[in-house]
């Protein structure tokens, strides 16, 4: 096969994958910056709002993006939006949890922490970097079905070099 044909096939494959991602099924979810906002919305009761917030906080410690330095974290999430978390194997920098998402899943509720980036501080993002759509006044939004799956625990730390260096990721 000629080089040009391989290139066209590659572009076609990328295009199909891109369209598949755009057409991903959406599910309704609830997003809130705090327990108080969840309670005020009136969609669920206070006990549920508190319990799901606690679940999101616990999950945050496992799935939050990890950084080797404050500067790297601040670059992605904004100045003073990160904190140092000392662990048995050393310490890492994590972004603050800025909200949480509740998504009905069968007879239960799936919950995960949400973050705000420095480049888009008015939107929520999942720990995997998925952008969460704008919510209505009561917190309702539509998210890609893939964003309502359990995020993977983070075992890697992001580190970036200076001018002319590459970003690296190391297991923790």
Q: Across the structure, where does each feature detected by a protein language model lie?
A:
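Low-complexity, glycine/proline/serine-enriched intrinsically disordered segments
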Residues: 2-5, 11-15, 23-172
């Amino acid at each position: 096969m000629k080089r040009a044909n391989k290139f066209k096939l590659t572009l076609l494959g990328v295009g199909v994958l891109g369209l598949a991602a755009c057409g991903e099924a959406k599910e309704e979810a609830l997003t809130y910056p705090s327990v108080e906002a969840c309670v005020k919305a009136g969609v669920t009761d206070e006990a549920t709002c508190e319990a799901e917030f606690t679940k999101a906080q616990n999950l945050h410690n496992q799935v939050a993006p990890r950084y080797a330095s404050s500067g790297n974290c601040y670059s992605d999430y904004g100045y003073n939006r990160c904190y140092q978390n000392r662990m048995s194997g050393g310490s890492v920098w994590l972004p603050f949890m800025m909200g949480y998402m509740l998504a009905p899943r069968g007879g239960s509720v799936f919950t995960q922490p949400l973050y705000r980036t420095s480049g888009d501080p008015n939107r929520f993002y999942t720990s995997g970097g998925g952008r969460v759509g704008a919510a209505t006044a009561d917190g309702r939004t539509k998210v890609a079905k893939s964003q309502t799956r359990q995020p993977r625990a983070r075992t890697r730390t992001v580190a970036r070099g200076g001018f002319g260096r590459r970003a690296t990721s190391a297991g923790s």
